[in-house]
């Protein structure tokens, strides 16, 4: 059994939302967004206390099943430390089940809090590994851990037994690029949306997406003029349009007007990456149809402050 962390030590975490895929980079590209959840984890004498306000309040479990708690416990175990008890408080602004990385943010917050309580013994890639384990892919978690843009990948062991190895590397984002999120007033299940995807795609479509993913990395870092071309996709958005017709309508409409729009993660949120704001008339129309429209900057990495 490892060292026990003293009662009273507290980790306060600010974790960003994220968007994944960015059009062609399915389960590969991610981007941290300036919308945040805040988590405080304090060591107490015994037991577990969980409090949630904001997004998810009254909907998520307030016990060991809570994702922040699960990720925090996993991190403490990896760091070989223990706690007599925990008080976890979450103040959430990231909409849940909307394609903005709420679950990855929760996992990242738990990992960051655990790492802070343990004395910052784990490096960034170790934190990406633990957080991604709860996701099954590292694009969102990588973005929340590292900030800015990320290229991510997964190495799946051939023995079929060992755990996958998740990796992410940061891409600095051109300072002129901003995000506009069009957030519909309904949820989407990532698992359900993934089920509509075919098991195979054509070589032509695969080649198309490989090239546009490469273009997108250049667009993000150096050349925002390439954002429209870099967000083109033939791998997943067409299939998901069948179950997200409102989202598909807005993606197509925005793109036809020249905006680099795409499905954010599994949706239903639509994201535009550009150097210019979206026309106010479109924004007001979207709001009139029940959408929340947020102008977001590109975020830095998860932040942790430890006291006690």
From Swiss-Prot:
Keyword flag Amino-acid biosynthesis: yes
GO cellular component, one term: cytoplasm
Record field: catalytic activity: L-homoserine + ATP = O-phospho-L-homoserine + ADP + H(+)
Pathway: Amino-acid biosynthesis; L-threonine biosynthesis; L-threonine from L-aspartate: step 4/5
Binding site for ATP: 95-105
GO BP annotation list: threonine biosynthetic process
Keywords: Amino-acid biosynthesis, ATP-binding, Cytoplasm, Kinase, Nucleotide-binding, Threonine biosynthesis, Transferase
Entry's Gene Ontology molecular function annotations: ATP binding; homoserine kinase activity
Functional note: Catalyzes the ATP-dependent phosphorylation of L-homoserine to L-homoserine phosphate.
Name of the protein this chain belongs to: Homoserine kinase
Record EC number: 2.7.1.39
Family per similarity comment: Belongs to the GHMP kinase family. Homoserine kinase subfamily.
Broadest EC class assigned to this enzyme: transferase
Subcellular location: Cytoplasm
HAMAP family: Homoser_kinase (MF_00384)
InterPro entries membership: GHMP_kinase_C_dom (IPR013750), GHMP_kinase_C_sf (IPR036554), GHMP_kinase_N_dom (IPR006204), GHMP_knse_ATP-bd_CS (IPR006203), Homoserine_kinase (IPR000870), Ribosomal_Su5_D2-typ_SF (IPR020568), Ribsml_uS5_D2-typ_fold_subgr (IPR014721)
Taxonomy of the source species: Bacteria, Bacillati, Actinomycetota, Actinomycetes, Mycobacteriales
Origin: domain of life: Bacteria
